[in-house]
């Protein structure tokens, strides 16, 4: 994996583990890529301790050159170090239009009209993240501004992410709101037939079941059996193989905790590596499900180590604006996912631990109990979405 995709996986799993520990027994769903883009745009203008905290949490500090000092006065975006230009390339690869798959990532900065932003910051964020600044009046038109931002997000996510900022969540004293929206709708390479979908039990925990709409098909898919912790790993590609859903299904409910405990960038890469997965005929049972989640990220990011950014006194965003006291007052992440027969609508140990030999002719993959899933960009190995289905 390249340095950027490694950082993407590490950050994704850090966020997952933090959300998982704070939402025990709940469904989890978020876009790690969306968060990474948004925080990288902040990093572009961060300096000092704020910059160091962000680089560490995003796992950039050991993978690429950090931002060079003097960026705010420099005439070229190339002065800002390699990470953002790498992002620019990745962004264009992932954001390519495709008639069979809708994937749109949209970034925008909302700044108070009284705030001066460095022109260099604005031009570089537009070049690499296609993020434009829109000036608004937080102080005098707070409610109107909130509606403006929500309407933009709703439009960019095809109406799936509505009311991102609820009433009273934007303060009149706000000076900057950074918004990142991501929307995905993909068709399966091998669609499930609606006539094959049946009502079936889904085991939530020992002795507790719910009835779900269980989709079914027999097809040729990449599958791996992991011995420790015991699980099946299935890859369901979307049309054109640009993206795929990776499902980590524990053998029995008890193994889920072990998978979560051992999950890191190394084990994820090992478990989901194409060299460890064998193409074979598989009977797939997968529940139809929809997830809609909303997370306040302030406390989550603070617990990961980004503390100064949310502190008006300590935050150093001098690469973004010469104005003192600029900080991020609120970070909210809302996601939507719909998995159906057609496809998905949404807004990765030693070689011995993976068994790829002596498999039965046809394998069964029965997702009738909680599992983890990831939507991944095949070419770059970038994780776009990450989740846990605890209860459909």
UniProtKB/Swiss-Prot annotation:
Record-level Gene Ontology MF annotations: serine-type endopeptidase inhibitor activity
UniProt cross-references to SMART domains, sorted A to Z: SERPIN
Consequence the record notes for mutating residue 148 to M: In allele SERPINB11a and allele SERPINB11c
Record key words, sorted: Cytoplasm, Protease inhibitor, Serine protease inhibitor
Subcellular location as annotated: Cytoplasm
Superkingdom of this protein's organism: Eukaryota
SUPFAM superfamilies registered for this protein in UniProt: Serpins (SSF56574)
Organ and tissue specificity: Detected in a restricted number of tissues, including lung, placenta, prostate, and tonsil.
Residues annotated as site: Reactive bond: 357-358
Gene Ontology terms: cellular component: cytoplasm; extracellular space
Region spans: RCL: 341-365
Outcome, altering residue 293 to I: In allele SERPINB11a, allele SERPINB11b, allele SERPINB11c and allele SERPINB11d
Primary location recorded for the protein, binned into one broad class: cytoplasm
A Pfam family of this chain: Serpin
Keyword Cytoplasm attached: yes
Entries under InterPro entries matching the protein: Serpin_CS (IPR023795), Serpin_dom (IPR023796), Serpin_fam (IPR000215), Serpin_sf (IPR036186), Serpin_sf_1 (IPR042178), Serpin_sf_2 (IPR042185)
Family stated for the protein in its record: Belongs to the serpin family. Ov-serpin subfamily.
Known function: Has no serine protease inhibitory activity, probably due to variants in the scaffold impairing conformational change.
UniProt-recorded name of the protein: Serpin B11
Species of provenance: Homo sapiens (Human)
